[in-house]
Each structure stands twice: as C-alpha cells, then as structure tokens.
Amino acid sequence: LHKFTSNRRTMSEAMGPVEHLIAKGPISKYATREPAVRQGPIPELLTNYMDAQYYGEIGIGTPPQCFTVVFDTGSANLWVPSIHCKLLDIACWVHHKYNSDKSSTYVKNGTTFDIHYGSGSLSGYLSQDTVSVPCNPSSSSPGGVTVQRQTFGEAIKQPGVVFIAAKFDGILGMAYPRISVNNVLPVFDNLMRQKLVDKNVFSFFLNRDPKAQPGEELMLGGTDSKYYRGSLTYHNVTRQAYWQIHMDQLDVGSSLTVCKGGCEAIVDTGTSLMVGPVDEVRELHKAIGAVPLIQGEYMIPCEKVSSLPQVTLKLGGKDYTLSPEDYTLKVSQAGTTVCLSGFMGMDIPPPGGPLWILGDVFIGR
C-alpha cells in the first residue's frame, strides 16, 4: 500500500468545503442505506504519503491494466475511470482509464450506476472482467490473486473537483454486500466465493511513519505476524453493512467521557481522521484546548501537543489508548508547521447513524 495526502487536506488548502472532501463523502457513505487453486495469504503493499490515506495497485482485464485504488472498508463497490468518460471530466483526464477493447476477458454489462458523494454524483456503467491483486506481482509482493468475473463500475463522470487532485484512480470497497450499489458482489466476497484464499480474512497494517519501508500492507487471506505481538482481539460486528462494532465509551484523560452508555462505531480505512457527533467532538476539542479554524478543522499549538491528555477508546471492555502524538497531525505549508486535531465533528443521520468513524488515526496506532 502507498500513503498519500488526503483529498480533504489537498482540497482544504484550495478552500473547498470540508463536507465535500472528508472520507470521499461520508454523509452518503453512512447515511442510507459471496474454482481456483487455494493459496496462502496474499500481501499487497500499500504506500504511505504524508501520513494521510493509503492506496495500492490492482489490475483489471487480460492483460491487466494497472490502477491505484483506495482499499476502503467503508464502501463496497469497485470503480475506476473509463476510457469513455465525459469530455469535461477533468479528473478522468489525469488518471488511468480502463479500456475494455484491450481486454480479452471483458464481458459487457451496461447497467448504469450512481454513487453519491458530498460534492455530487459519480456515475457510469457496470462491466465485468478479471481483477488482479496486485497488478503485477514482484519480489516485494510475491504471488498475487486473480478474481474472475468481477463486476465493477466504469466511471464516466466524477463529481466536482474532489477527484482531480486525488493520487488514486479509483476505490475498491471492502464492506459488506448489503451496502453495495446495484447489489454488486464486492471483490473480497467474490474472492471468497471462488475459494482463492484459505481463510476468509483480510487485514491491514497502516504505519503512520512516512519514512518506514515497507510502509503499510493489506493481507488477503490472513494476517502478517511480523506486525503485531501477542494474540489478536476480536470484536463482534453489530450490523453487517459497514465494519460496525460497539464502542463502550471514549475518555479524554480523566476530564471528559463521550459516547456515554455506549455507541456504534465504524472501522473505516477510507477515512483519514476520527469522526464523531458534532456536539461530542466539540466537547473533546474543548478538553484538549484545540482552537477552531475554518472548514471544520481545529488547531493545537505544536509546543503543547506533548502535554495533552491521552484519548482512550473502550471497545468490548478493552482499552485502546491514543497518545497526543497519535491523534494530532503535523502539516507543513509555506515553511510553517502547524498541528491539527485528528478529530472531526459530523452528524450522520439515521438510519445509518449516529456513528463514530474510526479512521486511519485509530487504525494506524
């Protein structure tokens, strides 16, 4: 996997409204709405860019056409730009495009699809082809897996300017089929159905150290023991749509508790920050002395970060503690370094919400 500056950061610098940018449109992500030779776990290296979001490479077609995608546990569809995208779709011009004429395994579908984001609707039509992870296996990522007959979206219109600056071409959703647009079987569910891995498991290692090599990894079919000590802790999925679990509470030092009495939370690799209800996050920022900026961001004086309280999430009776360095982000611009809070307030309405979203700030710890 590779890390890149989030759309939110890139577009925020261009004064775009944050509601259009964070998590590729979480309002719509959360508001509404299963024979080849088996093999061992398949690693996919992810790249870390400026401690923000993560992408990896896949191939679509025969021979494979390579695309960079966000492996997103907060959505369930795979889409990439199409060679047939609209003339005025600038985002399409600057990214790799799928060309069905160059694939011997392409099967026409043609059903139209729409995925709604805060800045507009991404639209196109469905197609079917093989999907390879990674695109071209190498010595650093041996093996690989090819999923046959995978339905995916060819995007012919991408909304607003959000995707223009993106360092990824598309998105590969890894949530449950229940939230898949057009009821398309997600890639990993198709992979399981075709019995391409011994264990129906995938795992992420996200390293927030941008200098670390290899930086991050997605493992299909298992876990990589070199990235953890001891035994794994399991939490029940409370609703098979997103990777949704129950959070008992969230403590800010000894001065504040939010999510009192418990709440629901989503573990989402496609969101950079931790997102919670507006009123609760406002209280959290008050407790850590963060100062509001424009566009929903909060700043913390960098010299005060080390003295901030720890933030502890209690999940299934187990404490997961974030240090101040874990939940703050250093951003340098025009020679000046500022420290931003890793928390964002956003109210997610029923039936999907209210929810906390545990993004890369949490997962990367």
Swiss-Prot record:
Q: What is its EC number?
A: 3.4.23.5
- Principal localisation: other
Which superkingdom? Eukaryota
The record's subcellular locations are:
Lysosome; Melanosome; Secreted, Extracellular space
Provide the disulphide bond pattern: C66-C135, C85-C92, C259-C263, C302-C339
Q: Which residues are glycosylated?
A: N109, N236
Keywords recorded for this protein, A-Z: Aspartyl protease, Disease variant, Disulfide bond, Glycoprotein, Hydrolase, Lysosome, Protease, Secreted, Zymogen
Processing and modification events after translation: N- and O-glycosylated.
Name the Pfam families for this protein. Asp
Tagged with keyword Protease: yes
Give a GO molecular function annotation for the protein. aspartic-type endopeptidase activity
Peptidase A1 domain mapped to chain residues: 54-365
List the catalytic activities from the record.
Specificity similar to, but narrower than, that of pepsin A. Does not cleave the 4-Gln-|-His-5 bond in B chain of insulin
Query: One of this protein's GO BP terms?
Result: proteolysis
Record's keyword annotation contains Signal: no
Propeptide positions: 1-39
Q: Mutating D268N: effect?
A: In CONCL; inactive
Give the PROSITE patterns listed for this entry: ASP_PROTEASE, PEPTIDASE_A1
Active site location:
D72, D268
Top class in the EC scheme: hydrolase
Q: Describe the subunit structure.
A: Occurs as a mixture of both a single chain form and two types of two chain (light and heavy) forms. Interacts with ADAM30; this leads to activation of CTSD. Interacts with GRN; stabilizes CTSD; increases its proteolytic activity.
Disease (UniProt): Defects in CTSD are a cause of congenital ovine neuronal ceroid lipofuscinosis (CONCL). CONCL is an autosomal recessive disorder. Newborn lambs are weak, trembling, and unable to rise and support their bodies. However, they are able to vocalize, support their heads, and to suckle if bottle-fed. At autopsy, the brains of affected lambs are strikingly small. The deep layers of the cerebral cortex show pronounced neuronal loss, reactive astrocytosis, and infiltration of macrophages. There is severe degeneration of hippocampal pyramidal neurons.
Q: Which family does it belong to?
A: Belongs to the peptidase A1 family.
- Please explain the role this protein plays, according to its UniProt record: Acid protease active in intracellular protein breakdown. Plays a role in APP processing following cleavage and activation by ADAM30 which leads to APP degradation.
Q: What is this protein called?
A: Cathepsin D
Task: State which gene encodes it.
Answer: CTSD
